[in-house]
Every structure is written in C-alpha cells, then in structure tokens.
Design a protein with these regions (language model features):
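Extracytoplasmic gate region of multi-pass secondary transporters
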Residues: 18-20, 226-284, 344-345, 349, ...
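Central cavity-lining transmembrane alpha-helices of secondary-active solute carriers
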Residues: 41-56, 273-286
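C-terminal ends and interior cores of transmembrane alpha-helices
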Residues: 72-92, 312-325
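Cytoplasmic helix-loop-helix junction between adjacent transmembrane helices
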Residues: 102-142
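C-terminal transmembrane helical hairpin of 12-TM major facilitator-type secondary transporters
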Residues: 300-347
Length: 423
C-alpha cells in the first residue's frame, strides 16, 4: 500500500500543479478565469474518456504494466507544459490551444491510475480491510495535495512556473523506477510474500491455478450485468456528483483564496494544503468507519452510512464556510468540507471491489469516467457561476450537488456482487 500511496501522491502533484502555477500563467498570457477553466476541463475530458479503456487494459494485462505506461504518459505531459510556449511560438499555434492539448494528453495518462490502484487493492487486501485500504489509496492523493501547493508555489516564485512542471516530470520518472523495482501484479508473484501471508490476504485462494483462473475471467468483463444493475447506476451517478464537488476544491480553492479572500501567493498556497491534509486524514478514517459498521451490520449498511455521514457533513460545512466573511474561520470550514467529501469517497472505491471483485478496474474506470465528467462540468460551470453570480453561489451549487451524491448512493448494495444479482 505504500507504493500505491506514493503513486497517488505523485498523481496529485501532476494534476494540481496547474492550479497553483495557473495564477502566474494567467498573468503571463493574459488568460481570464473562463479560459483557465477551459484548460482545467481539457485535463478532465482526457481523464474521463480513457478511464474505461485503461480499466479494461488493467484487468487484462495487470497493474504492473498498466501503471508503468500511465506514469510515463503523464510525466511526459508535465514536462511538455514547460516547453509549450516556445513550441507554440515556433509552430504559430495558440498557446491556449497547446496548453489544452497537453493537459488533455496528461489526463489520458493519469486516467489509468485510480482503476489500476483499485485492482492492486482487490488483489492484495483481505475482504474485511477493503474500506480502510481504499481510504489509504485516497489518502495518498490527499498527501500529495498537501505538499503540492507549497512545493509548486515555492518553485514558481524562485525558479518560474516552467521549472515546477519539469520537477513534476522528474518525480514521475523516479516513481516508475520504484514501482518497477518493487511491485508485482499478484501477491503470489512477489518473492517476499510467504504462504501464511497469502492465506491472510485471500484465504484458500493463492494457488497458481487460481491466479490463472482469475486472470482468464478478467478477460471477459460482464458489461451487460454491470449496466443493468441499480447498484452500479447508483454508484456511478453518485460519483458524478462527488466529482463535481471534489474539483471545486481541487481546481479552484487556490484561486478562491487569492481572488476572493485576498491572500498572497505563499499564504494562499499554505491554505490550499489544508483541504488535502483533511482528505489525507479523513479518507482512511472513512474507510475504517465503513469496515467497522460492515462487520456489525453488513457491507451495504457500512458503505451507505459512511457516505451519508461524509457527504452530509461536507455539504453543511461548504455551505456555511462560503457565506462567512471571516477568512480564518471560513477557509478551515471549506477545507474540512473537502475532508468529509473524502471520508465518503473511500467507500466508492471499496464498493467497486465489493460489486465486481474480479473486474474492479473496469468498474472503477466506468465510475471514474462519470466522476470526471462531473469534474469537467464543474471546472467550467464553477468559473461561469463565479464570474456571473459570485463565488458564494458557485459554492452553494457544489454543496447541493454533494447532498445529491449521498442520496444517490442509497441505491448501492455493496453486499451483493453484480454476478450474484438475479437476472
């Protein structure tokens, strides 16, 4: 799980870097808020459209090769951002257009990460620990987001925004080296995992024959059963709403701190770490809470209660924080709203494994596609609402959609796989 958290942290770094360096880019090239929203959306469309293909590839070929290709792709995209203005000038292209193309490509690369990490969790964790393990995965994203604002702001101030992207690219390459050195697709393939540990991970299911059986099954994803399942539709639509709210924090918190709350660059960067610190802490707590309830009342109740609690508290905090005038109270409340969003989010990923244990990467890809369509809509809609109706109204809409996420998740029955469902 340590390597999974590292990959998620580096993913956060390469996704969030534009949100911090974006203020400097905006000033250098004369972009307005709506144009920056288009650049943010470009990443998310690439990220959303390639979730399902990457999920299938991971189920078919395993996370080892899939994540290697993924990290190389988005690391290359980060490096290209630094040279984009020079390329645009020499080719006679619009810098805005080239930024959008590169961020789309970066999104394509990052699209494999979450489905592949879910596949790792499905292969490497015990049934009773899925919620907590999924929380650690999401917590890795939070840890990366905690460090990124200060790291990117510091490197941008001292060395320029281009250097910040080159550093992100270099860290991605280092992560590939670590991943290839230590990871395997299955616990059975790892030299340091013994028979007792295999029995603890998947009791009675660690033989080579069983591994080959599971690999063969993964080649035929039961899409019809998935797409006719009320649980799957509840899951993916709820995650679409979650994605809308999540990308308000992810893309716009720094801009909000600078433009609305009047903070300076480093001060805003420090505050921008707060939502991700809250995510890093509360995501594993949400997974642990869900696992604990699941052992007492069943997985359906465990996942639903955790999502209801997380999304409900998140909506209240976001709504209250957006209308408070006192910055030192408002920003922590909005940061905690992000944290409780992720208290719930770990249970979405765990539910992918609950519903489709042998096809978890494919279902995760489907879910994350819808989630990031919500995020892409959020990136543009939040900018539009902020410009035309004010930031309070933009955040009110995000709070309302957060409530919708919790309500839609009520249809998810994590106690029954899609293959067990009567036809």
């Amino acid at each position: 799980m340590g390597i999974v958290m590292l990959i998620m942290a580096v993913t956060a770094l390469n996704r969030l870097n534009l949100s911090i360096a974006g203020k400097t880019i905006e000033e250098e090239f004369g972009f307005d808020t709506i144009k920056m929203g288009h650049i943010f959306s470009s990443f998310l469309w690439g990220y959303a459209l390639f979730q399902i293909p990457w999920g299938y590839i991971c189920d078919r070929f395993g996370p080892l090769r899939t994540l290697t290709a993924s990290i190389l792709c988005f690391g290359f995209g980060a490096g290209m951002m630094g040279v984009a203005p020079r390329l645009a000038a020499s080719a006679g292209l619009s810098v805005l257009l080239l930024f959008q193309i590169i961020r789309f490509f970066t999104g394509v690369g990052e699209a494999a990460v979450s489905p592949s990490c879910v596949r790792v969790i499905a292969s490497w964790t015990n049934l009773k620990e899925r919620g907590f393990a999924s929380g650690l995965q999401s917590g890795g994203l939070g840890l990366g987001g905690t460090v990124t604002p200060i790291f990117i702001a510091w490197s941008t101030i001292h060395y320029g925004w281009r250097t910040s992207f080159y550093l992100c690219s270099a860290l991605a390459l280092l992560t590939v080296v670590i991943w290839r050195a230590y990871a395997t697709d299955w616990p059975e393939e790892h030299k340091r995992v013994n028979a007792a540990e295999l029995d603890q991970i998947h009791p009675g299911a660690h033989s080579g024959d069983d591994r080959r059986r599971r690999t063969a099954k993964a080649k035929s994803v039961p899409w019809l059963k998935m797409l006719t399942s009320a649980s799957v539709w509840g899951l993916i639509l709820a995650y679409g709403c979650q994605g809308y709210a999540f990308y308000v924090y992810y893309n716009w918190f720094y801009f909000y701190a600078v433009k609305v709350r009047g903070l300076h660059m480093m001060e805003a960067a420090a505050w921008t770490s707060a939502p991700f610190l809250a995510m890093a802490v509360l995501s594993p707590v949400g997974g642990w809470f869900s696992d604990r309830i699941s052992r007492r009342s069943g997985r359906r109740q465990g996942r639903i209660y955790a999502v209801w609690l997380g999304m409900g508290v998140s909506a209240i905090l976001l709504l209250a924080g957006s209308h408070l005038r006192i910055t030192v109270i408002a920003l922590p409340m909005i940061a905690l709203a992000a944290g409780f969003n992720y208290f719930a989010t770990s249970n979405f990923w765990a539910s992918c494994i609950d519903l489709a244990p042998d096809f978890s990467a494919s279902l995760s890809g489907l879910m994350n596609t819808v989630g990031n369509v919500g995020g892409a809509i959020s990136s543009t809609a939040t900018a539009y609402l902020a410009v035309h109706q004010g930031w309070s109204r933009a955040l009110d809409v995000a709070a309302l959609i957060t409530v919708g996420s919790g309500l839609l998740f009520s249809f998810v029955n994590a106690g029954q796989t899609v293959e067990e469902r009567p036809t």
